[in-house]
């Protein structure tokens, strides 16, 4: 903008769409990126990819990045104010990673797969089991407005741990069933 200096850092604050847009802008501008998620509904703050949408809510483009996010700041007190439906969506998205990896092609073993894919599968299985056990308690704590250890752990799982799994997979070798379903709904029902 007329004589303005180029930014030295970009800060993205918001939900998945805003964070994905911030990642795309930071990559294009080649500036460091700090992300501050306001929802635990996605792993957008941690995953090295951006999903860009049209005004109508349809997926236009998916960008994959080689560079990881420079910094992520998560404030559990902020996340505790999100609607329970967003936390539930994040839990289901995180749990879906295991199912997606299992149904993304050939059997994954340490012997026949890239080692990062093998470890992503193991991590996704642990994540699935953890959220199966703790997810409902976290939702109840959120509904009561209590910032408990379980809720904090689920926030971490939805944002960071799921993002690590996504980063290891690099968007390959997983069915991404949850995303296909979401994109269909979003395209036909933009309010979702």
Label each PLM-derived region with a short phrase.
Residues 13-15:
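Glycine-rich beta-strand-to-loop/alpha-helix junction loops that act as flexible
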Residues 17-23, 43-46, 174:
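Short glycine/serine/threonine-rich phosphate/pyrophosphate-binding segments
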Residues 112-192:
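Active-site segments that bind and position negatively charged phosphate/pyrophosphate groups
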Residues 27-122:
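A glycine/threonine-rich phosphate-anchoring loop and its flanking beta-alpha core
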Residues 9-11, 34:
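Conserved beta-strand elements of the Class I
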């Amino acid at each position: 903008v007329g004589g303005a200096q180029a930014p030295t850092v970009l800060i993205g604050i918001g939900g998945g769409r805003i964070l994905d847009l911030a990642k795309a802008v930071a990559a294009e501008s080649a500036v460091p990126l700090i992300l501050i998620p306001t929802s635990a509904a996605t792993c957008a703050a941690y995953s090295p990819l951006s999903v860009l949408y049209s005004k109508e809510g349809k997926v236009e483009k998916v960008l994959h990045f080689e560079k990881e996010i420079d910094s992520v700041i998560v404030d559990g007190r902020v996340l505790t104010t999100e609607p329970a439906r967003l936390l539930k969506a994040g839990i289901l998205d995180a749990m879906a990673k295991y199912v997606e990896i299992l149904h993304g092609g050939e059997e994954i073993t340490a012997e026949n797969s890239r080692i990062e894919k093998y470890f992503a599968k193991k991590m996704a299985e642990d994540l699935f089991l953890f959220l199966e056990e703790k997810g409902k308690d976290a939702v109840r704590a959120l509904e009561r407005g209590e910032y408990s250890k379980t809720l904090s752990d689920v926030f971490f799982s939805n944002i960071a741990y799921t993002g690590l799994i996504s980063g290891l997979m690099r968007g390959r070798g997983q069915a991404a069933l949850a995303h296909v379903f979401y994109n269909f709904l979003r395209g036909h029902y933009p309010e979702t």
